[in-house]
């Protein structure tokens, strides 16, 4: 039983719902049901319960935050919607995500305790219900207050949390106590769990009060050392309750919906019909009974024609989807997400395509970029970061719409091919897996696939939760399995290795004591200057010298808190004193590459935009690479500007220094751009800063070895820029003496090319242009000579009469010449069958003779291929005589 003092002292009684069997607390003696859907209908539509007047979402948000500030909470800024600090999920799905796993595990203290926040969040669990149910959103703000209770520090727990909720709704918002129900439940998410109260008012869940004290391990609940108050008050839900509009979309997006309706020519629906439809939709699950059946049931309950209801509701659903999804996508892009086929980009593209799909099915049309721009104008006051990203958002939305149009053009052929493949496998039509494959591989929405299939005489059922299932496959990050040269158990008892490479990155040699030798080749020292592989930087190499011997260090890896050296040759004995010597030339080159990587990523961001995020990196010799999120290949001018900016930073000889900072302090000072290189799992993080404190050039959390100043890099040269995946661009670059060697090699090749072209290096461009003109003229002449030669050969073909047809077989391994000969010969002789054999292939041309019988005969002698009515080609390894005889039989 979950209880609280405020409930008992305020006249609440515990009851059990006869329908769902849940326990709940209410002041009303006549309340029978739990107050949640589907047990009760909405009772606030057209009849809001609050006395307080709330003007806007901003007003409601401010009331909430001020209420908790008055109650000794610290207001903190909202976090981004992309969870850069986590390695398990892409998007923030609730305010508690901001503090998982570091704060909830006890590894890092919270930024304040207790605290209050209003956190933009994204959940695609119910994406298929958005627009239909009247209440579901993909993007929403979760207002929350959190308290973190430690074994030695109690803040507050169930009693105080419940009292805050009661007082906020009754005193701050003026909702009568009798309207509020507290329903007992259990919550689980993000690896944690706990009992909870769901706060319900007139059938609508407006808040959840979670008392988190479990960690979920292998399906079991394990007590956490912390007891965490995790609350969630739905900003949009509460605002809807206070406004009493037919749907949450009308309350939250009212001004935008009015503009969108006017632009698209969609009439405003009857409020009474939409209100009743919303009430009934809220009490049923279309995924269970089917969407079309749900329309029929609701139409009957309202007393209207089902067809009329669909005609009224569906355009509104499309607008609701547009309003919700466009805000969510704008949040994502403003936070650095590029629509693509992977990761968070996949989810952004999915939402954009759902907008386009719904608008198309509703029969309304306008450039999506225009509809987005209208919404951005509405959002700019609440979310200034979205307005700042307006140019990028509109560019990406326009690109996505053009791609979608191309997808629609290619859909008929792709769906037809998929249907043929399904039939070959013994199935009559397409199943859910086929629809997923068509969407993931070619971007074809299932509704479009169903339309095409229907036009071909096949009915295809689209699952009502199709997009939710797609999203569920992409919301979590894939964790790469970690490999280790040594089992953790073999070094767990050893003390932490002193990491001299952090104390002095320029240390070339050092003395140390051997703590353990494992399997004759893994050496653990008490301290080391050898850098272990990590963060895209390769491990150091070198030697360990000891009395009576020397071992070559070929690899270095971190295993927990210990650094393990992989050696070749006889290892030093345990307890021995050794002298470690780092391959300094290699290490120094890698330091230049690593510091150069930081300079380059910041230069890329400054030229291409703040949406640039590192998607991977590898520092190596003689070249390194960095992969970044970007929607197109940068122009030559942009690459030149990036390179120039990077080398200006090198010339400025900016100071480079690392400092250890508490995680919260670093995040508060620099933001989550710290994690360009990925998540850093530590209470304290090593922050690498380039440039002075008053104007740093770049700041990142980084565990690599670096230079003292950018001047030591010498030169940064971009060697290649390529698009390696949808939404990912790779920069290959080099630094220092390797960059000089690369430039010198380019100079040598330029001089050699100039010599071949017949000019000096300064005249190379003009010389190449002349050569290109000559080559073009020679190519024109060659094509003309080939046509004349083909025509001559066509006239002199030796063909034999086979029945009423003429057959000619020619040995020729030149496809282009064969095509020209065939074109000339078959255009003047419709009864000609012309076959070219060579290079393990056979090609058949005819003037008008059907090749089907010929192909059938050829397959009997080893031909593997096919074609059209008058053309066939494929593999043929046999002899010419056998081929001739097969064709003669076919023509006889």
From Swiss-Prot:
Binding sites annotated in the UniProt record for Zn(2+): 594, 598, 702, 706
Cystine residue pairs: none
Example of a GO cellular component annotation carried by this entry: cytoplasm
Keywords carried by this UniProt record: Aminoacyl-tRNA synthetase, ATP-binding, Cytoplasm, Ligase, Metal-binding, Nucleotide-binding, Protein biosynthesis, RNA-binding, tRNA-binding, Zinc
Catalytic activity line of the entry: tRNA(Ala) + L-alanine + ATP = L-alanyl-tRNA(Ala) + AMP + diphosphate
Cofactor note: Binds 1 zinc ion per subunit.
Location(s) in or outside the cell: Cytoplasm
Entry annotated with the keyword ATP-binding: yes
Signal peptide (UniProt feature, chain positions): none
Top-level division of the source organism's lineage: Archaea
Pfam families registered for this protein in UniProt: tRNA-synt_2c, tRNA_SAD
BP GO terms, sorted: alanyl-tRNA aminoacylation
Main location: cytoplasm
Enzyme class, UniProt record, top EC level: ligase
GO molecular function, one term: ATP binding
InterPro entries referenced in this protein's UniProt entry, alphabetically: aa-tRNA-synth_II/BPL/LPL, Ala-tRNA-lgiase_IIc, Ala-tRNA-ligase_IIc_anticod-bd, Ala-tRNA-synth_IIc_core, Ala-tRNA-synth_IIc_N, Ala-tRNA_lgiase_arc, Ala-tRNA_ligase, Thr/Ala-tRNA-synth_IIc_edit
Cofactor: Zn(2+)
EC number(s) per entry: 6.1.1.7
Biological role stated in the UniProt entry: Catalyzes the attachment of alanine to tRNA(Ala) in a two-step reaction: alanine is first activated by ATP to form Ala-AMP and then transferred to the acceptor end of tRNA(Ala). Also edits incorrectly charged Ser-tRNA(Ala) and Gly-tRNA(Ala) via its editing domain.
Free-text note on domains in this protein's UniProt record: Consists of three domains; the N-terminal catalytic domain, the editing domain and the C-terminal C-Ala domain. The editing domain removes incorrectly charged amino acids, while the C-Ala domain, along with tRNA(Ala), serves as a bridge to cooperatively bring together the editing and aminoacylation centers thus stimulating deacylation of misacylated tRNAs.
Family: Belongs to the class-II aminoacyl-tRNA synthetase family.
Protein name per its UniProtKB record: Alanine--tRNA ligase
Source species of the chain: Pyrobaculum neutrophilum (strain DSM 2338 / JCM 9278 / NBRC 100436 / V24Sta) (Thermoproteus neutrophilus)
């Amino acid at each position: 039983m979950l209880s609280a003092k405020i409930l008992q002292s305020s006249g609440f009684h515990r009851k059990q719902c006869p329908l769902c069997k849940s326990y709940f607390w209410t002041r009303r003696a006549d309340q029978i049901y739990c107050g949640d859907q589907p047990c009760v209908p909405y009772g606030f539509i057209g009849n809001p319960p609050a006395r307080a007047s709330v003007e806007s979402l901003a007003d409601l948000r401010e009331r909430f935050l001020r209420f908790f500030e008055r109650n000794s909470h610290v207001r903190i800024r909202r976090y981004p919607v992309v969870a850069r600090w986590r390695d398990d999920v892409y998007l923030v799905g609730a305010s508690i995500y901001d503090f998982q796993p570091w704060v909830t595990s006890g590894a890092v203290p919270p930024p304040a305790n207790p605290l209050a926040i209003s956190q933009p969040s994204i959940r695609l669990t119910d994406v298929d219900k958005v627009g239909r149910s009247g209440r579901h959103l993909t993007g929403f703000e979760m207002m929350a207050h959190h308290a973190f209770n430690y074994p030695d520090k109690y803040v507050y727990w169930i009693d105080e949390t419940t009292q805050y909720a009661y007082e906020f709704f009754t005193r701050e918002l003026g909702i009568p106590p009798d309207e509020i129900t507290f329903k007992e439940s259990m919550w689980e998410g993000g690896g944690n769990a706990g009992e909870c109260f769901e706060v319900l008012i007139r059938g609508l869940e407006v808040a959840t009060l979670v008392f988190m004290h479990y960690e979920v391990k292998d399906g079991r609940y394990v007590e956490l050392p912390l007891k965490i108050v995790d609350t969630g008050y739905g900003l949009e839900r509460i605002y809807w309750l206070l406004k009493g509009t037919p749907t949450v979309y009308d309350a939250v997006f009212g001004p935008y919906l009015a503009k969108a309706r006017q632009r698209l020519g969609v009439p405003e629906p009857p409020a009474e019909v939409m209100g009743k439809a919303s009430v009934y939709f809220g009490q049923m699950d279309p995924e269970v009974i089917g969407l079309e059946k749900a329309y029929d049931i609701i139409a009957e309950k309202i007393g209207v024609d089902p067809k009329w209801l669909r005609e009224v509701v569906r355009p509104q659903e499309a607008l609701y989807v547009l309003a919700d999804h466009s805000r969510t996508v704008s949040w994502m892009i403003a936070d650095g997400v590029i629509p693509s086929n992977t990761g968070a980009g996949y989810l952004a593209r999915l939402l954009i395509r759902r907008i386009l799909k719904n608008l198309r099915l509703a029969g309304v049309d306008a450039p999506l970029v225009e509809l987005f721009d209208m919404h951005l104008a509405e959002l700019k006051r609440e979310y200034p970061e979205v307005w700042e990203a307006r140019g990028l958002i509109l560019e990406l939305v326009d690109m996505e719409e053009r791609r979608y149009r191309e997808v629609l053009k290619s859909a008929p052929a792709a769906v037809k091919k998929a249907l043929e493949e399904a039939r070959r496998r013994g199935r009559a039509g397409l199943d859910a897996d086929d629809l997923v494959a068509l969407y993931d591989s070619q971007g074809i929405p299932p509704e479009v696939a169903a339309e095409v299939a229907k036009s071909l005489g096949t009915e295809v059922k689209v699952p009502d939760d199709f997009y939710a299932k797609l999203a569920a496959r992409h919301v979590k990050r894939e964790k790469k399995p970690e490999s280790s040269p040594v089992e953790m158990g073999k070094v767990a008892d050893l003390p932490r290795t002193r990491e001299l490479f952090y104390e002095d990155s320029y240390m070339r040699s050092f003395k140390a004591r051997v703590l353990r030798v494992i399997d004759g080749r893994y050496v653990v020292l008490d301290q080391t200057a050898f850098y272990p592989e990590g963060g895209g930087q390769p491990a150091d190499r070198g030697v360990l010298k000891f009395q009576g011997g020397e071992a070559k260090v070929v690899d270095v890896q971190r295993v927990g808190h210990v650094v393990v050296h992989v050696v070749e040759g006889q290892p030093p004995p345990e307890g021995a004193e050794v002298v470690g010597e780092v391959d300094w030339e290699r290490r120094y080159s890698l330091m230049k590459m690593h510091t150069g990587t930081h300079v380059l990523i910041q230069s890329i961001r400054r030229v291409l935009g703040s949406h640039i995020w590192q998607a991977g990196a590898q520092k190596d010799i003689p070249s390194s690479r960095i992969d970044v999120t970007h929607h197109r290949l940068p122009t030559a001018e942009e690459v030149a500007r990036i390179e120039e900016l990077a080398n200006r930073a090198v010339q400025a000889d900016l100071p480079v220094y690392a400092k250890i900072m508490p995680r919260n302090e670093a995040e508060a000072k620099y933001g989550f751009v710290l994690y360009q290189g990925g998540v850093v799992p530590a209470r304290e993080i090593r922050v690498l800063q380039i440039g002075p404190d008053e104007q740093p050039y770049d700041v990142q959390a980084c565990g690599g070895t670096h230079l003292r100043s950018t001047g030591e890099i010498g030169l940064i040269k971009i060697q290649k820029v390529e698009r390696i995946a949808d939404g990912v661009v790779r920069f290959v670059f080099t630094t220092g003496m390797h960059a000089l060697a690369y430039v010198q090699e380019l100079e040598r090749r330029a001089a050699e090319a100039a010599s071949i072209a017949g000019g000096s290096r300064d005249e190379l461009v003009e010389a190449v242009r002349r050569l290109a003109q000559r080559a073009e003229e020679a190519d024109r002449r060659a094509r003309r000579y080939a046509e004349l030669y083909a025509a001559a050969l066509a006239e002199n073909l030796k063909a034999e009469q086979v029945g009423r047809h003429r057959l000619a077989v020619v040995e020729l391994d030149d496809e282009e010449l064969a095509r020209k000969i065939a074109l000339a010969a078959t255009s003047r002789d419709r009864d000609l069958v012309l076959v070219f054999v060579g290079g393990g292939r056979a090609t058949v041309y005819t003037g008008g003779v059907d090749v089907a019988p010929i192909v059938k005969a050829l397959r009997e002698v080893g031909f593997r291929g096919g074609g059209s009515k008058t053309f066939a080609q494929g593999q043929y390894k046999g002899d010419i005589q056998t081929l001739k005889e097969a064709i003669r039989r076919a023509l006889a």
